[in-house]
Swiss-Prot record:
Role noted for this protein: Probable UDP-sugar:UMP transmembrane antiporter involved in UDP-alpha-D-glucuronate/UDP-GlcA, UDP-GlcNAc/UDP-N-acetyl-alpha-D-glucosamine and UDP-N-acetyl-alpha-D-galactosamine/UDP-GalNAc transport from the cytosol to the lumen of the Golgi.
Topological domains, Cytoplasmic: 1-21, 87-106, 156-158, 263-276, 338-343, 389-437
Protein name as catalogued: UDP-sugar transporter protein SLC35A5
Segments passing through the bilayer: 22-42, 66-86, 107-129, 133-155, 159-179, 242-262, 277-297, 317-337, 344-364, 368-388
Predominant cellular place of this UniProt entry's protein: Golgi
Gene that this polypeptide is encoded by: Slc35a5
Lumenal domain ranges by topology: 43-65, 130-132, 180-241, 298-316, 365-367
Residues in the signal sequence: none
Alphabetical keyword list: Antiport, Glycoprotein, Golgi apparatus, Membrane, Phosphoprotein, Sugar transport, Transmembrane, Transmembrane helix, Transport
Length: 437
C-alpha cells in the first residue's frame, strides 16, 4: 500500500511538472541575452573582415596579427578573472598546476581545440576573399551537415530519417547555389575599400613592399592559388563550378565542427563540468597564442614583413575594431558551449545568415539572381525541418546539470533537448590516468 501511494505521489508530481509552462526566469533570460550577443558579434565580425580588405579584396595587414591580439586579450581577461576565482575559492588553484602526468595530459588536451580554432579563425579571412558575405554565411550552413556526421560517427548520436532527409536537401541546395557564385578574387575586386593606414611606413618597409610587389604580393602568397593552377585542379568539378572559395568554406565547416564538438566535450566531461569557465579558457587561449605566434615566426614572409614594417603594418580602423569583436565573439562561443550546447550555437548562426544577406544586398551591391531566391529558402527550410524533427524526450523532466559560474553559486540548466550533451557528460567508470592524453 505504501509503495502504491509513493508511485501515485511521484506520478502527480511529474504531471504538475509537465504542465508547468516555462517562464522567463534567469536561465531563460541568460540564454536569450547570450544568443543576442553572439548574433551581434558574429554578424559584426564578418562585416568587419570584409570592410578591412583593400580595393583588390586583399588584406594590407597580416590576418594572423588580428588573431594573436584577440587571443591575447581573451587570455589576459580570463587570467584576471581566474585569479579572482582562485582567491575566492582556494581549492580550485589545483587546476593551474601540472605537477603530475595526469594534470599535464589534462592540460595538453586543450591544445587540440586551440589548433582547430587557429585554423578556423585564419581561413575565414580567405573565404571572404573569394565569396560575397551573403554567400559565405549561406555556405557555412554546411557545418550543420558536418556537425551531424561527427555526432553520428564520433559520439554515436542517432538521427531519425527525417533529419537525414533534411540534411540531404540541405546538401543539394548548397551544391545548387554554387552555380551562381563568384569565387574569384578578380571578380570580387572593387568591392573592397580604401583605408588610411594608421602608421607611416619606414624606408625599409617601402623597399620591402616594393620587392614584394615585384614578387606578386608575397604577404598572401602561401594562402592563395593562381587562377590558372586552381582552374586546372578544379576542372573535374567544372559542371558545378566548384571554386577555391567553396573548398575553403567546406574545410572550415569540418574544422569548426570538430573544434566545437571537442571543446564542448572537454568543457563538460567529468569534474570539468563544475570548473570555472575562465580557468578552462585560460588554457585554451594560451595554446591559441602559441599556434598563432608560431605562424608569424615560422612563415618567412610574415617574419620579414614584421621585421621591416612592424607588427601593426597595414591595419586600419576596421581591423582594430575586428580584434576586439573577434575576442568577445570567441568568449561568447565558449559560454554557449559551456552552459548550452552545439545545437544552440548552430541555430544562432542561422539568424546571422539572414542579417548578413540583408546587409550584403544593401551595402555590398549583392544582387541575388532568381536561382538564389529559389535555392536559399530551401537551405533555411531544410534547417527548420532538421530542428523541428528532433525526437522529444521520453521523460518530461529533463536532466539538470549544475554548472559553477563566477559568483561561486551553481546554475542549474536543462540538458534534455540535446542527446549529445548527455553523451558528452557521461562519466566512464574505467577511466585511468593512462588514457587521459
Amino acid at each position: 500500500m505504501k509503495v502504491i501511494f509513493l508511485r501515485q505521489l511521484k506520478t502527480r508530481g511529474m504531471e504538475r511538472k509537465c504542465s508547468r509552462r516555462p517562464g522567463l526566469g534567469p536561465p531563460t533570460l541568460y540564454t536569450f541575452l547570450l544568443g543576442i550577443i553572439f548574433i551581434t558579434l558574429s554578424s559584426s565580425r564578418i562585416l568587419l573582415v570584409k570592410y578591412s580588405a583593400n580595393e583588390e579584396n586583399k588584406y594590407d595587414y597580416l590576418p594572423t596579427t588580428v588573431n594573436v591580439c584577440s587571443e591575447l586579450m581573451k587570455l589576459i581577461l580570463c587570467i584576471l578573472v581566474s585569479l579572482c576565482v582562485i582567491k575566492k575559492e582556494d581549492h580550485q588553484s589545483r587546476h593551474l598546476r601540472c605537477t603530475s602526468w595526469k594534470e599535464f595530459s589534462s592540460f595538453m588536451k586543450w591544445s587540440i581545440p586551440a589548433f582547430l580554432y587557429f585554423l578556423d579563425n585564419l581561413i575565414v579571412f580567405y573565404v571572404l576573399s573569394y565569396l560575397q558575405p551573403a554567400m559565405a554565411v549561406i555556405f557555412s550552413n554546411f557545418s550543420i551537415i558536418t556537425t551531424a556526421l561527427l555526432f553520428r560517427i564520433v559520439l554515436k548520436r542517432h538521427l531519425n530519417w527525417i533529419q537525414w532527409a533534411s540534411l540531404l536537401i540541405l546538401f543539394l541546395s548548397i551544391v545548387a547555389l554554387t552555380a551562381s557564385t563568384k569565387t574569384s578574387q578578380h571578380e570580387l575586386a572593387g568591392h573592397g575599400f580604401h583605408h588610411d593606414a594608421f602608421f607611416t611606413p619606414s624606408n625599409s618597409c617601402l623597399h620591402f613592399r616594393r620587392d614584394c610587389s615585384l614578387r606578386d604580393n608575397c604577404t598572401s602568397k602561401e594562402w592563395t592559388f593562381s587562377e590558372v593552377q586552381w582552374n586546372t585542379t578544379a576542372r573535374v568539378f567544372s559542371h558545378i563550378r566548384l571554386g577555391l572559395g567553396h573548398v575553403l568554406i567546406i574545410v572550415q565547416c569540418f574544422i569548426s565542427s570538430m573544434a566545437n564538438i571537442y571543446n564542448e566535450k572537454i568543457l563538460k566531461e567529468g569534474t570539468q563540468l563544475t570548473e570555472s569557465i575562465f580557468i578552462q579558457n585560460s588554457k585554451l587561449y594560451f595554446f591559441g597564442i602559441v599556434f598563432n605566434g608560431l605562424t608569424l615566426v615560422l612563415q618567412s614572409s610574415n617574419r620579414d614583413q614584421i621585421q621591416n614594417c612592424g607588427f601593426f603594418y597595414g591595419h586600419n580602423a576596421f581591423s582594430v575594431v575586428l580584434i576586439f569583436v573577434t575576442a568577445f565573439q570567441g568568449l561568447s562561443v565558449a559560454f554557449i558551449l559551456k552552459f548550452l550546447d552545439n545545437m544552440f550555437h548552430v541555430l544562432m548562426a542561422q539568424v546571422t545568415t539572414v542579417i548578413i544577406t540583408t546587409v550584403s544586398v544593401l551595402v555590398f551591391d549583392f544582387r541575388p539572381s532568381l536561382d538564389f531566391f529559389l535555392e536559399a529558402p530551401s537551405v533555411l527550410l531544410s534547417i527548420f525541418i532538421y530542428n523541428a524533427s528532433k525526437p522529444q524526450n521520453l521523460e518530461c523532466a529533463p536532466k539538470q546539470e549544475r554548472i559553477r559560474h563566477l559568483s561561486g553559486s551553481l546554475w542549474e540548466r536543462s540538458s534534455g533537448d540535446g542527446e549529445e550533451l548527455e553523451r558528452l557528460t557521461k562519466l566512464k567508470s574505467d577511466d585511468s590516468d593512462d588514457d587521459t592524453l
